[in-house]
Amino acid sequence: MADHLTANGEEMGVYNLQCIDLSNPDIHESAALLRKACMESGIFYVINHGISQEFMDETFAQFKRFFDLPIEEKMKLVWNKNLRGYRPPIQAVIDDKTKQKDFSEAFHIGVEVSEDDPNAHDFFYGPNLWPPADLLPGWRKAMEKYHQEATNVARKIGRVIAVALDLNEDFFVQPELIGSANANYTNMFHYGVHGANLLKDVVGTTPHCDLNLFTLLATDDIWGLQICREKNAESQVWEAIAPVKGAYIVNVGDMLEMLTNGIFRSILHRVVFNQERYSTGTFICPNHDYIIKCLPTCTSEENPPKYPTMRTGQYIYNRFNQLSASTVGKKA
């Protein structure tokens, strides 16, 4: 069976991404490539980001250790109201036409927050859930280390994005954006869990745009990620993205589209696959009190702001409420 498939099991085209080399001493050259990618599609590769392949391989081995646990152990860590912890397989129909199902499971972490933090129980923020140390020795330390390293890469990308938008290079690394990293979160994904017939079913995740600024996606060598560059088109054309060893795939999210007044485009994407697959996404988000409004370099009299001004926390809350409502509506 082909590596890259439509949701109906048909072969599809491959979209070739721009590649941003973070070791390039000429940040303006990198910024020009990034700007082109973000205007044309909203997705690109990042290489020479500072994380070794050995570290990435070990991190993916750690993901597998958790997902290999008995479901009874994983369910003891089922995600809380702050969306930290284990998200069990949905196993729900995600496409009414094809009757395809989502058999993925995930684990969600963020920056560790103590129980006595005044904001510890805010939506999408709060203490993490961890498996007992005697069950998975060293697992928490490995996951916290990965989250920290991925956030460091995000800061490097943020500098290139700033230059691409004619802003001060440090704009996105200020504390309320990427700098403090308080609102960033990392999700680990396992596709093709128990119950999926991988020789028959092509299973995946619902098409969506990420709500945050941008996402760092790392995958194993199994194909699965697909994009639609014309997200508002009536007839959507899907293209496969090749997994590249040692590279991050970076998705533009809706918040960055809003900040740039639509100059940078968030990318509609999904996962469709026919083999067991692992991936991880680190979602870069401003602090919840940050006001999302059009950047001064992205508006003019001829191009007034297109999006409403909104506090980040309220935007996240609204988006998840919409998602919950659409899910309930679909099941009904």
UniProtKB/Swiss-Prot annotation:
Query: One of this protein's Pfam families, by short name?
Result: DIOX_N
Molecular function GO terms recorded: dioxygenase activity; metal ion binding
Instruction: Give the matching SUPFAM superfamilies.
Output: Clavaminate synthase-like
Q: Which Gene3D superfamilies match?
A: B-lactam Antibiotic, Isopenicillin N Synthase, Chain
Per the UniProt record, the lineage of the source organism begins with:
Eukaryota, Viridiplantae, Streptophyta, Embryophyta, Tracheophyta
Give residue ranges for domain Fe2OG dioxygenase.
181-286
Give the required cofactors: Fe(2+)
Query: Known catalysed reaction(s)?
Result: (1S,3bR,4R,5aR,9aR,9bR,11aS)-1-(1-hydroxy-4-oxobutan-2-yl)-3b,6,6,9a,11a-pentamethyl-7-oxo-1H,2H,3bH,4H,5H,5aH,6H,7H,9aH,9bH,10H,11H,11aH-cyclopenta[a]phenanthren-4-yl acetate + 2-oxoglutarate + O2 = azadirone + succinate + CO2 + 2 H2O
Recorded hits in PANTHER family, A to Z, give:
2-OXOGLUTARATE (2OG) AND FE(II)-DEPENDENT OXYGENASE SUPERFAMILY PROTEIN, OXIDOREDUCTASE, 2OG-FE II OXYGENASE FAMILY PROTEIN
Alphabetic keyword roster: Iron, Metal-binding, Oxidoreductase
Q: Biological process GO annotation list? A: biosynthetic process
Q: What is this protein called?
A: Azadirone synthase LFS
UniProt-annotated binding residues for 2-oxoglutarate: 277
What is the top EC class of this enzyme, as a single word? oxidoreductase
What does the UniProt record say this protein does?
A: 2-oxoglutarate-Fe(II) type oxidoreductase involved in the biosynthesis of limonoids triterpene natural products such as azadirachtin, an antifeedant widely used as bioinsecticide, and possessing many medicinal applications including anti-tumoral, anti-malarial, anti-rheumatic, antibacterial, anti-inflammatory, anti-pyretic and diuretic effects. Catalyzes the formation of azadirone.
Say yes or no: keyword Repressor present: no
Organism of derivation = Melia azedarach (Chinaberry tree)
Q: What is its EC number?
A: 1.14.11.-
The family line of this record is: Belongs to the iron/ascorbate-dependent oxidoreductase family.
Pathway entry = Secondary metabolite biosynthesis; terpenoid biosynthesis
What the entry lists under PROSITE patterns is as follows: FE2OG_OXY
